[in-house]
Amino acid sequence: MKQVLITGASSGIGKQLACDYAGNNWNVIACGQNQARLNELENHHSSIQSLQFDVTDIESTKTALSQLTELPDLIILNAGTCEYINEGVIDTALFKRVFNVNVFGILHCIEALQDRFTERTHVVIISSSASFIPLPRAEAYGASKAAISYISQTLALDLQHKNIKVTLVNPGFVKTPLTDKNDFAMPMLVTPEFASQKIRHGIEVGKKEIHFPIVFTLFLKTIALLPFTLRMAVIKRITGK
């Protein structure tokens, strides 16, 4: 039976991916911090096994992942968080919290597992389309996602000689407990079910980058191609800033 390891599996996209893979006869190792939520997943799906640890703690991450007797070929690094600064007011403590999860949390998992990677290994890194262009108050979140997107792409280059695949995922707005906290309009908001289907299909067909919803993400990618002054003018217009 196929196996997948998913971090951030206790809610949102990660939870939906865990449920959908389990429903398609995969063995799922669901990783997260909240043991109660992980227990709920295990109780609903016999093919889900939980693994509780904090991705921001390298020793906790290494200890937990060392318990795996066999490394799944598919590894989905999905754990993430989001916080926004007050307009133009830098809060380094907030930046550290966001980067500790969105960047170092992913790096901790890779460091803990990389010695066991094989030519069958496929690493999927969940970033965000927020990395495409600057957005108001998203200094910490957008920068963390831009960082992990860059890391993902360079890893894809550096690991290709070992036949280790790396896929980057850039979702738009997905309805999750994180986005439920947003105090602004979220155009083309999609469900976790939609996100899971797009991610799983993209993985299955071997895409190097998965982004959705396509109209929204292509719109952002197009803006990113504009000359700087024009790009900033367009962003100001569409965000009302």
Which residues fall in each region the model found?
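Conserved glycine-rich cofactor-binding loop
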Residues: 10-11
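Conserved glycine-rich Rossmann-like NAD(P)H-binding loop of the short-chain dehydrogenase/reductase
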Residues: 24-40
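Rossmann-fold cofactor-recognition segment
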Residues: 45-59
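Substrate-binding pocket helix/loop in short-chain dehydrogenase/reductase
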Residues: 86-99
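Active-site helix of classical SDR
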Residues: 110, 144
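Residue(s) in the substrate-gating loop at a strand-loop-helix junction
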Residues: 128
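C-terminal helical subdomain
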Residues: 168, 184-219
